[in-house]
């Protein structure tokens, strides 16, 4: 999707910076989408080629020589000899947060660190996934699931580690607030929703945001991560 493609672009642009500043020499050895996967454990995938394929509307399975149409993301995770999994599939709460949940479970069990902006697996299996990560000595990082542009989870979990946090106040979904502001300005519901979609604030039919699912998911993650309250969505 857009996030994975943008990640590849940034990784390509920042390669020298990451090496010089942090001593990180990252190689993308595999990638998957809804139509297949590509895997090259020896040489790694060419980031520009991956971005070009996805920008053209093609599948990663069309990657020259290394594309695999029969593979799902879970097949790639179960096979790849990788250090880190970046999991950025759709939330899919109506499907039990799959395939993201299975991919993350498999990666943790195989000793991979996991970084994900995907709320779905965390709101249905937060405790399980953290226990898996701890038992296998790896990290599960998910700062991008809540207030991706702000260090909200980082502050709550690490900066304020010595504090007792007893209450959270938040506006967890900016899209909803944006639509409400337009309604207050006199626009109809349909007009406000259409403008939000045109301006890129609202995606798809908007139900994930406007029916409160996004806000609920973020609050579940905050409750678990910051307040240590074992909340989950079903």
Can you describe what each PLM-predicted range is?
Residues 152-165, 176-187, 217-231:
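Oxidoreductase and adenylate-handling cofactor-binding alpha/beta cores
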């Amino acid at each position: 999707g857009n996030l994975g493609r943008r990640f590849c672009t940034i990784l390509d642009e920042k390669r020298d910076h990451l090496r010089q500043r942090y001593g990180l020499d990252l190689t993308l050895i595999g990638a998957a989408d809804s139509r297949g996967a590509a895997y090259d454990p020896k040489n790694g995938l060419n980031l520009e080629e991956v971005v070009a394929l996805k920008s053209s509307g093609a599948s990663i399975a069309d990657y020259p020589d290394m594309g695999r149409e029969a593979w799902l993301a879970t097949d790639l995770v179960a096979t790849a000899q990788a250090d880190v999994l970046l999991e950025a599939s759709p939330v899919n709460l109506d499907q039990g947060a799959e395939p993201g949940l299975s991919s993350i479970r498999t990666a943790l069990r195989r000793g991979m660190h996991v970084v994900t902006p995907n709320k779905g697996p965390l709101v249905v299996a937060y405790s399980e996934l953290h226990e898996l990560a701890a038992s296998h000595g790896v990290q599960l990082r998910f700062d991008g699931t809540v207030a991706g542009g702000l260090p909200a989870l980082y502050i709550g979990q690490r900066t304020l580690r010595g504090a007792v946090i007893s209450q959270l106040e938040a506006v967890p979904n900016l899209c909803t607030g944006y639509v409400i502001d337009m309604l207050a300005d006199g626009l109809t519901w349909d007009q406000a929703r259409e403008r939000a979609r045109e301006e890129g604030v609202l995606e798809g039919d908007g139900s994930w945001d406007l029916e409160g699912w996004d806000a609920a998911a973020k609050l579940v993650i905050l409750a678990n991560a910051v307040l240590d309250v074992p909340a989950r969505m079903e």
